[in-house]
Amino acid sequence: QKACTMDYFPVCCQIVLGGGAYTAGNPCSCQGFVASKGTCDNPYPCPCTTEAQFPVCCTTQWGLVSATGNCACGCMGGVPVSDGPCPEVY
């Protein structure tokens, strides 16, 4: 159980399972998706810190990507296609 604070110091938040980080507020860290302190290299803040961070399979311009929530999916310009991580590609 992580301690949750509602301050909004930026953290680098991994919103894509296995990679892809976006700058987000501290509530992100409650969900365990923090890559590092401070802002990410990605210049765009992602307001995806208030929803439950359940994996979704998201269709994006890069193909199917497993994201940590519908908001994270939308943050990449994607559309959720199913709950849970995307199936492995063979």
From Swiss-Prot:
Q: Work out whether the entry's keyword set contains Plastid.
A: no
Query: What's a single GO MF annotation on this record?
Result: carbohydrate binding
Disulfides per UniProt: C46-C71
Q: How is it modified after translation?
A: The N-terminus is blocked. Contains seven disulfide bonds.
For this UniProt record, the keywords arranged alphabetically read as follows: Disulfide bond, Hemagglutinin, Lectin, Pyrrolidone carboxylic acid
Its annotated function is as follows: Lectin with specificity for complex N-linked glycans and O-linked glycans. Has hemagglutinating activity towards rabbit erythrocytes that is inhibited by N-acetyl-D-galactosamine.
Tell me the protein's name: Lectin-1
Q: What's the source species for this entry?
A: Hypnea cervicornis
Q: Source organism lineage?
A: Eukaryota, Rhodophyta, Florideophyceae, Rhodymeniophycidae, Gigartinales
